[in-house]
Amino acid sequence: MVNTRAEAEAMVRSCRYFPLGNRSNAGVRGEWGEFKNYRDYMDAVNNELVIVPMIETNQALGNLDAIAICPGVLLIGPSDLSIELGVPLDYQCDIYQRALDKIAATAAKHGIAAGMYFIPPAMDPNFFVQKGFKFFTMPWGPWAKAGIENGLSGIKR
């Protein structure tokens, strides 16, 4: 979660390697996989990393343009945002909808993607797509469990 441009910039710096940031190399990661040259590994990380600051507070809504200038995407934490707006889990109310519209419009203005941390219960994902949201995280636990159970069910014992 970020609330200011300074926090967003610090987040970006801590995720990227020198010269774009100050991320620790944590040992010999560049030797894992296809990279033989450590600089190539760091450049690949800097170029391919997706940085996702979460927008969950009134302060962040007030600083949205400044936050959106930083490289990355804007991700909404729907529950936390609704609580911060004084409308806990009321995803249909006007206050919440205006906040979503502001976030989607700001992301579009800055040429970045807006996303939702999850799709709130009983809401149609197309509703958010029509507002301009481009990606959604999904609750992976139940899906992973179903996939594992499905895969294991085919094993003859």
Annotate each predicted stretch with a short phrase:
Residues 5-21, 129, 141-157:
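C-terminal helical cap(s) of enzyme catalytic domains, especially alpha/beta-barrels
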Residues 68, 129-130:
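Non-catalytic positions within long, well-ordered alpha-helices that form the structural scaffold/packing
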Residues 51-56, 74-76, 114-117, 135-138:
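Hydrophobic faces of well-ordered beta-strands that scaffold small-molecule active sites
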Residues 5, 61, 93-101, 145:
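Non-membrane alpha-helical structural segments and their capping/turn regions in soluble enzymes
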Residues 16-21, 43-46, 92-115:
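Alpha-helix-loop-beta-strand connector modules within alpha/beta enzyme cores
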